[in-house]
C-alpha cells in the first residue's frame, strides 16, 4: 500500500519535526543528560538528522537491531520518541537486520501503517537524494 501525502499533510508532518516539545526534549537530552540510554541516542540522532536534512517526516535511518533489541534498546528508543511527543516516524533503514527490527518496533506498540517516502532538502543531504523510500509507523 502506497501512501499519497497531500501538501497540507506533508507540511503538518514537517511542523511535527519542529514542534517545541520535540525540540525541547532533544536539546535538553543533548545538554543535560550525561549518560543517555542507547535508545535515547538512536532517537536523538534521528531527530538531529531529520532536522539537519529538513526532512518532511521524522526519519529513522537506523533502528536498534540484534542483541540491542534483547537488551531493551528498542523499548528505550520508543520511550524517547514518546517523551518527545513524536507519534509517527518513517523508517528508511536498509540494513540486513531490518525485519527483526521492524518486528521489535511493532512489539513495542508501534503500528506499521504502510510504505511512504520522505523528502529531504538536497542541500542538506550529502547523497543529494530528495525522496527516500521507507516504512511509516504510528505510535
Give the label of every model feature segment:
Residues 114-139:
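C-terminal edge-of-domain segments
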Residues 1-100:
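An N-terminal amphipathic alpha-helical segment
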Residues 100-115:
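Short, aromatic/basic amphipathic alpha-helical patches
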Residues 26, 43-45, 112, 125, ...:
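Compositionally biased, intrinsically disordered low-complexity regions enriched in proline and serine
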Amino acid at each position: 500500500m502506497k501512501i499519497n501525502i497531500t501538501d497540507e499533510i506533508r507540511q503538518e508532518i514537517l511542523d511535527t519535526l519542529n514542534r517545541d516539545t520535540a525540540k525541547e526534549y532533544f536539546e535538553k537530552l543533548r545538554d543535560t543528560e550525561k549518560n543517555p540510554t542507547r535508545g535515547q541516542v538512536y532517537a536523538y540522532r534521528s531527530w538531529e538528522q531529520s532536522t539537519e536534512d529538513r526532512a518532511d517526516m521524522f526519519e529513522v535511518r537506523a533502528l536498534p537491531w540484534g542483541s540491542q533489541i534483547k537488551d531493551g534498546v528498542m523499548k528505550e528508543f520508543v520511550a524517547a520518541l514518546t517523551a518527545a511527543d513524536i507519534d509517527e516516524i518513517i523508517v528508511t533503514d536498509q540494513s540486513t537486520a531490518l525485519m527483526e527490527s521492524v518486528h521489535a518496533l511493532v512489539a513495542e506498540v508501534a503500528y506499521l501503517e504502510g510504505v511512504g517516502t520522505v523528502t529531504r532538502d538536497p542541500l542538506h543531504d550529502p547523497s543529494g537524494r530528495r525522496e527516500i523510500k521507507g516504512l511509516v509507523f504510528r505510535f
